[in-house]
Amino acid sequence: LSIQDVAALVQPSVVAITTEQMVSTNTWFGGSYVQSGAGSGVIISQDGYIVTCAHVVSGANNITVQLADGTEYTATVVGQDSTSDVAVLKIEATGLTPAVIGDSDSLAVGETTIAVGNPLGTLSNTVTNGIVSALNREVTVQGNDMNLIQTSASISPGNSGGGLFNGQGELIGIVNAKSGSTTNTGEATNAEGLGFAIPINTAM
């Protein structure tokens, strides 16, 4: 399949996620304010189950999911695991287009990868492509040591929770890190062309 074919195939399975969290202000007057966040997710069932990153939805009071066609739904968290940085959301919808789940254990370095997500929280359904740069890369994300797929596909804040697909359009990873992560030697990974994804076999 061409990258164009894969993009057309997988875009309906990727959603944009926006969150609102009530944050208490530690001032003498008390009070609180709403903090907004953004991320991405991947539909894994026709009836509204969506996989994303735990850090995207952690602590959120309100979660809104926007489908590729612009329809918005309120989502609830049905499960999350901060160690693997995976969360599952549920929206009340039917007839959705779930991603085809691939096998991340069969990936090879140099294979084509296509990342689809919502970079910067405003550019929903953005498609970038690259290759598998490395496998089983040890990266610390939000204090957790993880073995991740490294990809050269462009990853930006807001891509977290989006899909990393192979050349056949199968979901092989959940994008979860770019800038602000550190390698196991402690350097910050702000370099371009350096994105990471949770292998789908770990996430599922």
Describe the role of every protein-language-model region.
Residues 1-204:
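Serine-dependent protease modules
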